[in-house]
Amino acid sequence: MRKKKKSLTEVSALGQYIPMSVHKARRVIDQIRGRSYKETLMILELMPYRACYPIFKIIYSAAANAKHNKGFEKEDLLVWKAEVNKGPTRKKLKPRARGRSYLIKKPTCHISVVLKDISYYEAYETLYNREKYLPSNFRLKSSGAIWDKK
């Protein structure tokens, strides 16, 4: 098993065995991926889905980890990675008439969120003019490339 390399700017939180369908959790996770921490909290508070509350708690926990463990400011955090994986299915028996029983399946999921501190990258961009260091084929401003034509 390969060991994950620790990043200096990333903080993660993991919620396991959350009693919820993977599809319902992914519907919410897809809305918040790539957004800032504050914007994510506002979106989760206003969305009318039951999946929002556990995801809200996980993101809040990741931000608390960032503040406590690495000393990051919450305003500089960005939802870098967010994924939902399928967990084990809990099975229950529901009693029915004439001594029969029906199987009820309760799905679970694992949610992992990685927050990244972008203040480091903003300082890098102000220090170095990034366009100067890009290769010539990346500069598309009026270069006559296909992007200039409509």
UniProtKB/Swiss-Prot annotation:
- Database matches in CDD domains: Ribosomal_L22 (cd00336)
Keywords (alphabetical) are:
Chloroplast, Plastid, Ribonucleoprotein, Ribosomal protein, RNA-binding, rRNA-binding
Q: Does the keyword DNA-binding apply?
A: no
What GO terms are given for molecular function? rRNA binding; structural constituent of ribosome
Name the GO cellular-component terms: chloroplast; large ribosomal subunit
A GO biological process held by the record: translation
Keyword Transport applies: no
Localization per Swiss-Prot or TrEMBL: Plastid, Chloroplast
User: What does this protein's UniProt record list under function?
Assistant: This protein binds specifically to 23S rRNA. The globular domain of the protein is located near the polypeptide exit tunnel on the outside of the subunit, while an extended beta-hairpin is found that lines the wall of the exit tunnel in the center of the 70S ribosome.
What PANTHER family does its record include? CHLOROPLAST 50S RIBOSOMAL PROTEIN L22-RELATED, LARGE RIBOSOMAL SUBUNIT PROTEIN UL22M
Family label: Belongs to the universal ribosomal protein uL22 family.
Q: How does it assemble?
A: Part of the 50S ribosomal subunit.
User: Which named protein is this?
Assistant: Large ribosomal subunit protein uL22c
